[in-house]
Amino acid sequence: LEKKPIIGADLIEAYRVNGWWVVDKKGAHEVGDLVVYCEVDSWIPHTLAPFLTKPGHYPREYLGVEGERLRTVKLKGQLSQGLLLPLVEDNSEEGQDFSEILGITKWEDTRYMANMDARGNFPDFIPKTDQERVQNLDRTLEKYFGQSFEVTVKRDGSSLTAFVNGEESGVCSRNVNLKETEDSAIWAAANSLSLIPKILSTGRNLALQGELMSQKIQGNYEKVQGIEWNCFDIYDIDTQEYLLPKERRELCKQLRIPHIKVIDDAFVLCHNVDQLLEMAEGPGVNPGVKREGIVLKSNEAAFSFKAISNSYLLKHG
């Protein structure tokens, strides 16, 4: 744990955990302390932190639990992302996960998924589409300095995975395997792009993963007309490995599958967390749209992460 004063603030100061800055009461923690850090987009039960609910308001409810979602905020000009709590156990160790003990879950926007029929759970032979945030890799990045990375735009939509595994095929949202119904926008998008037939044409067991955007998803932040889907990953189910960026791009071109926008296909990593967060700022794909952030994937190894634009988080996150 590190800390620094906030100019013009007498009662609060900024504390740094890994790559995250959190504003808390002055003197609440000391340099080197072990604390429980709750990341942005955590759902914090009201019983754990009632002060997160605005005075005079009732707590919100998510998955049957009253509480609040942690968002990115600015206090006295200082970015604050997360919440610091005292240790739960005296014999706690660095890196220990207390989410289950404290009843903290990850918040996800379920409004768009409310009317979707699940065929089953997300397949256990495919990883879910989730990248680690760069702030959690503060001590890891140096291991990859000098390596070549692909840098792509991160778009604000909904995850779509189409797969073929032997006789089984399907289309999934971020968390579930979906039934093919007439009103399923995800299945409609997969069918319009012939994703499953295109996988079958390769003779391989693959999962195509990408971002689905439309006028009905996430308030159409990306300002798309109709439906757009961009592939950002291809997973080889037999080898249980993601294709490296170059092979993925080549296969997308061969199959005529729309690929996510590439900013740099040979970016040499030698940047710290703050520098990568600065890189996350910038234009998106469509005119007048700022990007949600960037995703970096090693051209040499199975290592990838995301850097989300702080200006995006302050306005939309």
Question: What is each of the regions a protein language model found here?
Answer:
Residues 1-317:
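Core nucleotide-handling region used for phosphoryl-transfer chemistry
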